Amino acid sequence: MESIPVIFLDRDGVINSPAKSHEYITQWEDFIILPGVCEALRLFHDNGYKIFIVTNQRCISRGIASSSQIDELHRMMTEDFARNNCYVDGIFICPHGYNDNCDCRKPKPGLMLQAQKYLEDSEGVTVDKTRSWIIGDSKTDEEAGVNYGINTVLIGGDPVSKNNGMKHLTAHDILESAMKILEGSN
């Protein structure tokens, strides 16, 4: 089976402005797409990457938002992307809380495994882990990438993981992440 490079993106803090501490973004009017997102998405697609959003949304398990509310928010996000000539190839959500003992909540790699299965089933390709990355703004995102066996970019922090055969970068935002990843792939 052919393998292809994939970019996995956390949502809050990478795609959109993060919510205030202990709050959740559940409505479109609170969803502020960060500068450079569409430019980064276009750069990745132009260079042969598939792009998936992988996001923990425990607001669902806590009853703060329904799955359909989050789906609607993501529908509006993808429509906004389309108006700006960019897109993602899929969105994978963990609706569970910390103590639900699921396989999908980051730092577990379940969301990335779901995306991999989607690629294998729908396109007959798999993830090339040596050329794939997760971009996130938390240690949990970075740990998920390490647990899945891919390279990581931590936005706004210092990488925790070192010397495990993978690349670990830092960046100010998604656009700088794209430039660093693409610069290193040439």
Labelled PLM ranges:
Residues 74-93, 163-182:
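Structural recognition of alpha->loop->beta junctions
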Residues 62-78, 103-117:
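Short, electropositive alpha-helical surface patch
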Residues 27, 88-90, 128-132:
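Short acidic capping loops at alpha-helix termini that bridge into adjacent secondary structure
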